[in-house]
Amino acid sequence: MWLKTQLFVLAIAVIALLEVHAEPESNDNNELVVEEARGCADAYKSCNHPRTCCDGYNGYKRACICSGSNCKCKKSLREMAAAAFGR
């Protein structure tokens, strides 16, 4: 019985040791998440200071409009008109 208790305690210690040294968020998508955070945001997607808005249709600049703490990239009127009339 004493041997079983010692083996159980040893197993718990090894599991705890391996858990401490495990890499947090060590999945394949981690690089994609970091790259997406650095990139630009499309129209009607959330934006902030490090993540600016992408250029729109025909190179029109999009603005990051904030309402409280909710910031979204908005299309400009020129961009919407150019897309509607095919320019």
Swiss-Prot record:
Tissues/organs with expression: Expressed by the venom gland.
Swiss-Prot/TrEMBL keywords: Calcium channel impairing toxin, Disulfide bond, Ion channel impairing toxin, Knottin, Neurotoxin, Secreted, Signal, Toxin, Voltage-gated calcium channel impairing toxin
GO cellular component: extracellular region
Molecular-function annotations in GO: calcium channel regulator activity; ion channel inhibitor activity; toxin activity
Residues spanning the signal sequence: 1-22
Transmembrane segments: none
Pfam families tied to this protein: Toxin_9 (PF02819)
Protein localization: Secreted
Disulfide bonds: 40-54, 47-64, 53-73, 66-71
Domain of life according to the entry: Eukaryota
Pro-peptide positions on chain: 23-37, 75-87
Function: Antagonist of L-type calcium channels (Cav1/CACNA1).
Family stated for the protein in its record: Belongs to the neurotoxin 02 (plectoxin) family. 01 (Tx3) subfamily.
Comment field on protein domains: The presence of a 'disulfide through disulfide knot' structurally defines this protein as a knottin.
Protein name in UniProt: U9-ctenitoxin-Pn1a
UniProt organism field: Phoneutria nigriventer (Brazilian armed spider)
